[in-house]
UniProtKB/Swiss-Prot annotation:
Origin organism lineage: Bacteria, Pseudomonadati, Thermodesulfobacteriota, Desulfuromonadia, Desulfuromonadales
Region of interest: Disordered: 1-26
Record-stated family: Belongs to the bacterial ribosomal protein bL32 family.
Listed InterPro entries: Ribosomal_bL32 (IPR002677), Ribosomal_bL32_bact (IPR044957), Ribosomal_zn-bd (IPR011332)
Name of protein: Large ribosomal subunit protein bL32
Any one biological process term the GO annotation gives: translation
Keywords recorded for this protein, A-Z: Ribonucleoprotein, Ribosomal protein
Gene from which the chain derives: rpmF
Length: 58
């Protein structure tokens, strides 16, 4: 069974974990209703995508 020969220090552990964070999603604005939305997705508030009404919004 594989066992580490030396204890991993807090510095080495934290340097390894430096890239494990989640990045914030890019937020764009809807050109029709000016609400914030995720790119390449239908707008939640007005239901439009690429200038066309795709989904009936409530």
């Amino acid at each position: 069974m594989a066992v580490p020969k030396k204890k991993t220090s807090k510095s080495k552990r934290d340097m390894r974990r430096a890239h494990d964070f989640l990045s914030a999603p890019g937020i764009s604005t809807c050109p029709q209703c000016k609400e914030p939305k995720l790119p390449h997705r239908v707008c939640e508030s007005c239901g439009s995508y690429k200038g066309k009404d795709v989904v009936d919004a409530e």
